[in-house]
Amino acid sequence: MKLYLRSILCCAVLCAFFSQVKAQQDFLINSKNDTLKGEIKKQFIGFYRFKPEGGTSFNKIPIRETKEFYKVEKEINYLVKVRPDKSSPDFLQRLVKGKIDLFEYYRQSGNNQYVVIWYASKQNGQLFEVKSNQIFGSRKERKDSMYNLIADNPGLLEKFKKDDSYSFEAVKECIKLYNSN
């Protein structure tokens, strides 16, 4: 009898656990602001694909018809944004969400070379390049953009300038500190 009750209890716990896990699922927001639930998976070569709830196949996520998508399992959020000096939109991964959002553009090319560019925007405004691993472009301009974004917090601005570290981690931590105030 005890074994029977334990089995029932175990099944009930497992059912409750799996029903909660299913409730947290991937989603895509299209250009009409409709939220579509489903499953998102990353291709080995290429980008992410989406299968709507009840659908049978995964399709490439169309950039011109999408605002953002979120992959629950990896907590990855991509938004469609037009980068400065570009005319067509790209998917940018949102690294930090708050008063200042931090986005990452990542492109891999042959020979294990990759480009990482971080952009920031304040209150969903214009994107500014704040950090990059490229040798092109002015580091001073990127720093100035970062300083302008946090200028309304003089204490943080002074601390950031004084630390004189402009690594990817330092930029991310500064934005997190700004957002926490």
Predicted feature descriptions by range:
Residues 1-25:
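Bacterial Sec-dependent N-terminal signal peptides
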Residues 6, 114, 140-141, 166-169:
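Extracellular interaction modules
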Residues 7, 26, 34, 160:
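Residue-level detector of functional hotspots within protein domains
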Residues 29-157:
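Aromatic-patch recognition
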Residues 147-181:
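C-terminal partner/receptor-binding element of secreted or periplasmic proteins
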